[in-house]
Structures are given as C-alpha cells and as structure tokens.
Amino acid sequence: MDHYDSQQTNDYMQPEEDWDRDLLLDPAWEKQQRKTFTAWCNSHLRKAGTQIENIEEDFRDGLKLMLLLEVISGERLAKPERGKMRVHKISNVNKALDFIASKGVKLVSIGAEEIVDGNVKMTLGMIWTIILRFAIQDISVEETSAKEGLLLWCQRKTAPYKNVNIQNFHISWKDGLGFCALIHRHRPELIDYGKLRKDDPLTNLNTAFDVAERYLDIPKMLDAEDIVGTARPDEKAIMTYVSSFYHAFSGAQKAETAANRICKVLAVNQENEQLMEDYEKLASDLLEWIRRTIPWLENRVPENTMQAMQQKLEDFRDYRRLHKPPKVQEKCQLEINFNTLQTKLRLSNRPAFMPSEGRMVSDINNAWGCLEQAEKGYEEWLLNEIRRLERLDHLAEKFRQKASIHEAWTDGKEAMLRQKDYETATLSEIKALLKKHEAFESDLAAHQDRVEQIAAIAQELNELDYYDSPSVNARCQKICDQWDNLGALTQKRREALERTEKLLETIDQLYLEYAKRAAPFNNWMEGAMEDLQDTFIVHTIEEIQGLTTAHEQFKATLPDADKERLAILGIHNEVSKIVQTYHVNMAGTNPYTTITPQEINGKWDHVRQLVPRRDQALTEEHSRQQHNERLRKQFGAQANVIGPWIQTKMEEIGRISIEMHGTLEDQLSHLRQYEKSIVNYKPKIDQLEGDHQLIQEALIFDNKHTNYTMEHIRVGWEQLLTTIARTINEVENQILTRDAKGISQEQMNEFRASFNHFDRDHSGTLGPEEFKACLISLGYDIGNDPQGEAEFARIMSIVDPNRLGVVTFQAFIDFMSRETADTDTADQVMASFKILAGDKNYITGDELRRELPPDQAEYCIARMAPYAGPDSVPGALDYMSFSTALYGESDL
C-alpha cells in the first residue's frame, strides 16, 4: 500500500513503490499534481478568505492545513498553536493528521516531521488522501463507490456523445471531449458541442476549463498543454478535477429535485382547480339544457294532420336518439368527475369541494327527474294523438286506394267500348273480340261491389266530419256517373260484335277454300322456278341428256297447271262480290294464307318466261360436253403411250445398272445413249402438258379414257431423269474407284455379282443382314459371337456413316477396295515426317517450310500441336498426333 493510503481506499490506491517510481520517472505527473492539488485546496480555502501559493511551503506550519480540513469537513478542530517554532508546527500538523485518522483513514508512513520539512512527495500524498476521503470516497453509483463509482458516473453522462469513450482517468480525457461532454450534458447552453473536433484537443480542453471556471465555480486545476504534452496524464490529477465536476453537478441535481417537488405539488393543485371549474361549467350547461327542454316536452297542442304529428314524433325520436344520450353521458361524467375530485382532494390533504348553490349532484338529479317525467307524459300524449289521427287517415286512405284502383281500372274503358275495331276485323278477330267483351262484362259485374264500397266510405267520412270531405264527395260522384255510362256502352258494343260475326263467317269459308288450293299450287310454282333456275353442273354427255329429258316432261304438265290457276282466282273473285254487296270493310287479308292472286299471276308469268331460257341453257351445255369429250380422248391417247414408255425406260436403266455386260466404259456409253434418247422425248411431254392445260381450263376433272394423270406423268418423267443421271454418276464413280485403287475389271465384275446376288429386291442397296451375308460369302469371318458383332458394327460405321440402314454399291466398292488395295496409313505418314525431321521426335516450322510447298507447310504448322517431350526445343511441333488425326485416329 501507498504510505499515505488507507484501508477504506485500498481499491483505488497504488502500491507505495509504484507511487515513488511514478514520481521519479515522470516529473510531469508531479507538476500536474502540484497544480491540481493547489487549485483544489484553494477552491475550499477561499471560502475562509485565504489561499496557498506553494503547496509544500504553505502547509508546513499546519495552520492552513487545519483550516482546509475545517472548511471541507464543516467541523471545528483543536485550537492550533500560534508559535513559530518547529515544535509548534509539528503539533499543528499532528492535530490535522489526527483529525484525518479520526475519519477512519489509516495513515501509513506520513509523519508531521516530513510535512514540516516541506517533503513534496509526502505533502502531495497527504493532500491526495484528503481528496480521496472528502471528495471521492462518498461518491456512490449503483453499489459502486469511489473510483469505480466516479468512472461509472462519467460513462453514464457521456454515453450519448460521439467520439467520447471514458474507460479510465488518464488517456480517455486527453482530447478534452470528455470534459466538454460532462458540461454539455448538464448545462448544454454553455458549450456548442457540435462544433468541437476530436483532432483539436487544446481547444477542447481550454474550452472546458474556461467554462467550468467561469460558470461552474470550478477552478482551473490543469493546463491543457500539460495534458496534451503528456503521453499519459496523471490519474490522480484527472480524478481530482473530475470529482469537482461531479460535486458541482450533484448540487444542481438537488436543486432540480426540489424544483420538481414544488412543480408536482402545484400541478396537483392546478389539476384540482381545473376539475372544479370543469364541474361547475358542465353542471351549468346541463341544467340550462334541462330548463330549455322541459317546456318543449310539456307542449300538448294537437295537430290537424297525421304528417304534422309524425314530424313531432320524429323530433321526439331525434331527441331520444341524438340529443339525450350525450346529456346522459355528461350527467354520468359529471358524477364521476365529482367523485374523482373529492377522492383526489382527500388523498392530497385538501378540503372537500363544495359546488355553487343549485349545482350540487342532488340538484342535478332532481332536475333530471323532472325532465324524465315530462318526457314520459309527452310520449304518451304523442302516441294517443297519433293513434287517433291514424284511424281517421286510415279510412281516408282506404277511400283513396279504392277510388284510385277503380279509376285505374276504368281508365281507357270508355274509349275501348266506343272504338269500331270490329269493322276491319277478321272472323277470328271478331270471335276474339266477343270473348274479350264477355270477359269485360264479367269484370264489370265484379267491380259493382267496389263502387258500392267507395260510396259507403265517402258517406262515413262525411258523418265523421273529415277535413277534406268536399274533395271526397266530388270524387265519389264522378265515379258513380262514369259507372252508369260504362253500362250503356257495354250493351251497345255487344250488339255490333254479334252482327259482324255472322257476316264474316261466310267470307271465312271462302277464304279457307282459297287457301287450301292456293298453297299447293304456289309450292308447285316455286319448285318449278327453282328447278328452271337451278345451275346445273355436269361432266358427261349422258348427264346433260338426262336433264333435257326431265325438262321436256315438265313442259307437258303446264296446261293442267293453268286450269288450276284459273279455278283459284275464281274463288277470290266470289269473295270480292260479297264484300261489295254488303259493304264489308275488309281491312285485313286472308287469315289462312298470305298468297295473293297477284302473287299467283306473277309467279305463273315468271314460270312461262323461264321455260325457253332453260331450253337454251341445256342446248349450250350439250355442245360444251361434246367438246370436253374430244379433249379427254386426245389426252388419253397420248398419256397411254407416254406412261408405259417411261416405265419401260426405268426398268431398262435398272437392268443396265446391275448387269455386267462389257466394261464400265461400255456401260457408261450405253447409259449416255439412253440419256440422249430420253432427252429427245421431251417434246412429247410438252405436247401432253399443253393438252392438260386445255383440260384444266375446261374444268374437266376425270377421264375414263386413261388411268394416267398429268401428275403421274410428271413424277415419272422427273424420276426417269433423276435415275439416269444418278446411274451415270454411279458408273463414273465406279470407274474413278477402280482406277484409283487399281481394281481390275474382273474384280469389279466379281463385286457386282456378289452385290446383285444379295440384292434380292433389286433396290440397288443392301440391308444390314444382306450386307453381312455378302461379306461372309466373300470370306469375311463374321460370326454371331460378341467379337463378330463388334467387327460387323465397325464395318457398318464405315459403309453407312450416316446410319441410314442401307449400303449402296458405291459404299460397297469403296470398302472392298480399301480392304484389298495398298493404301496410305498413319504410320507411313509419321515415318515420312520423321525423315524430314532428321530422325527427331518433333519437327520445326523452318524444316516444314524448307521441305514442303508453302501452302501445305503453313497448313501443317497451323494444325500441329506444340511438342511436349523431354527433348523439346522452342518451336517444336508434334507431327505424330497430327499424323494420327489425319486418319481419324485422334482429333486435330
């Protein structure tokens, strides 16, 4: 432990040897402690009207030391010695040290003699002990004390500030932002924290120290330059300075707490006063509303009409629904506020609230009772009055409804009975009108009761002195007069309808006879017109001859048809006589048919006109069919020659391609002669095309004189040209293969014989099984075992690379020539490259350009891969992989 430490402060004191070493190693700390401790002492001594200048000199006599302890403790010490001798000074210092010890601080190695002798280290240690005991030890924050408590307080206060991170009492304060943050947290008006910069510690420190000295009564205990110029400021100096801030702000906190307590008491009192004012106003408003409402509810003046009484009832319902509920809520809230106010006053030891006279809760309840009593009587009166008017209005409404129904029923009835629609009606319409009139008479009888009821209700309303009786009487009289008139018109109309019915029944029988005979005759004429105008489509002479015969048969029926026409017109003329004789107004037409005599005559004339037109059309079509028949015969004669000729040539070419007569050159010469003869036949094809064009223009679609169509001829001709060209090409390729591979004519004939032998369908190709049998016949050992199947699959991939499933004769020749001839191999090419390379495993570009033509040398250089062997040189190329790639044994 430090020689001036105590047991109570062992958690924040350094060991003595560390204290000594610190003072010796860092004189800057001693300077900081001198200045800080001196300023701290003077901040208390000035209260006694004195101060110190030199801390180790001014405390030597013990007088100012005792005075300092009295100021900071508030207690009186023993009377000091006033002598100037050393013994007097030691006595005074001991009195001070004894007082410190009496406060529970156990001093170690601090003696009065060292203080009297001006020992700086001991003097600073003693002052630090005093600071710890009287300025820091009592600091407590959340169960932490002394140093930790002070540090926690600093961290709490500076937490919201950027660039401030208080972790200790030395380097955390070097930039000055910590001091500024403490001041701004408690007195934000003193410092504009937003303008401070972390990289300007001198300004920050001087700002904090100057503001603290000027406004917070905290003396300047350190120089900003000393803190900034020290790698680690003295912890005790910083703690002393910070503790001054703590005590300065803790006093302000106490004042704030006292002010808050006063504000709280005043707020409670103001709230109670506001509640009293609210109660008085609410009570006054509610009583005023009750006084205004009661006279309205006591008004019992009745209204003459139901509408007016219903409006009063609606107003009363609005009062119940809209106006009263808020007042009920106000009354309830008034009682709640009164009880709440009395409770708050009682809890806060205030006297009970006494409302103004007439505004007590009981006064309001009495007024409310009067309101509800008036309300109940008003509602009963309204309902009784409404029921009374309702009975009278019901009777009047019943009259109006019955009168309206009767008037609606009679509306248009007089006009209907006066109309003379029967004069232009048909018999069926007359019968319908009679049925309708009978129904009306039944309806008229049924309405007799309603008319009597209307008169009875009107009489009752007169007896009850209904206010609108004059209008009721006038309406009733009008209904009775109209009713008598309807009866007279009804009888008159019945007589007219029955007279007209008898006259029209005779005419109806004639109309029916006319309709029965006119309809089939009209259908016959329409069918005849359709047949005569029908657009016929024929393709043979036989068809046109059949149409001509049918037309002649139709013309033979025309005289009988004309007789039927005249008979039908006679019936219509008889009807016309009856109409003229009895002056019947025939506004309508024949109800049984829409066919008029004019229509019959018009259609008959049309039929007579269409007959010669049909004769001419049939004659022209007969001539056209004769011409078409000549075209058919001409085309058929040529097609029956050309078709077989093409088929014969196809067979001959196929036979030449598989026969083995003569050499390949002889076969090629023979085929070229065939090709020439085929080309010379082209004019006959063109002539046939011309005949086919004429047939198409004549719209001829079939030809019984030949089985060949132009499409068949075209396809056959194109196949013939393609076949001769392909066959010539195959023979030319066989000649090239023979010459390139050195195959003799005998070998070629043998290959052809083998191929033809197994080409049993003469298709010119071999299937896989046919090809396999052919290879076996030529001596290839291809069995059905896995090895044989693999070998055959390899051969098929050579002869059928596109996997078409067939082997042509050319592919067969190529395969057989490779199998029998001496061909180049990859090994031979590699051996040649090795010679050019001077027996090396690689070759260079210069060697290739020297030995090969330029284009072939560049081709090899572009495609050869770089050589990667151990004997490689720059620019070496791999001719071995290139050689195998040429024969498909690897990739280029």
UniProtKB/Swiss-Prot annotation:
It is found in: Cytoplasm, Cytoskeleton; Cytoplasm, Myofibril, Sarcomere, Z line; Cell membrane; Cell junction. The modification N-acetylmethionine is found at residue 1. Residues 1-247 are annotated as: Actin-binding. Spectrin repeats lie at residues 274-384, 394-499, 509-620, 630-733. Residues 274-733 are annotated as: Interaction with DDN. SUPFAM superfamilies: Calponin-homology domain, CH-domain, EF-hand, Spectrin repeat. The modification N6-acetyllysine is found at residues 95, 195, 676. GO terms for biological process: actin cytoskeleton organization; actin filament bundle assembly; actin filament network formation; actin filament organization; focal adhesion assembly; muscle cell development; platelet formation; platelet morphogenesis. Ca(2+) binds at residues 759, 761, 763, 765, 770. One of its GO terms (molecular function) is protein domain specific binding. GO terms for cellular component: actin filament; brush border; cell junction; cell projection; cell-cell junction; cortical actin cytoskeleton; cytoplasm; cytoskeleton. The modification Phosphoserine is found at residues 6, 471, 677, 890. SMART domains: CH, EFh, efhand_Ca_insen, SPEC. Keywords: Acetylation, Actin-binding, Calcium, Cell junction, Cell membrane, Cell projection, Cytoplasm, Cytoskeleton, Membrane, Metal-binding, Phosphoprotein, Repeat. Residues 31-135, 144-250 form the Calponin-homology (CH) domain. Its main location: cytoplasm. Gene3D superfamilies: 1.20.58.60, Calponin-like domain (1.10.418.10), EF-hand (1.10.238.10). Belongs to the alpha-actinin family. Homodimer; antiparallel. Interacts with MYOZ2, TTID and LPP. Interacts with DDN. Interacts with PSD. Interacts with MICALL2. Interacts with DNM2 and CTTN. Interacts with PDLIM1. Interacts with PDLIM2. Interacts with PDLIM4 (via PDZ domain). Interacts with IGSF8. This is Alpha-actinin-1. The gene is Actn1.
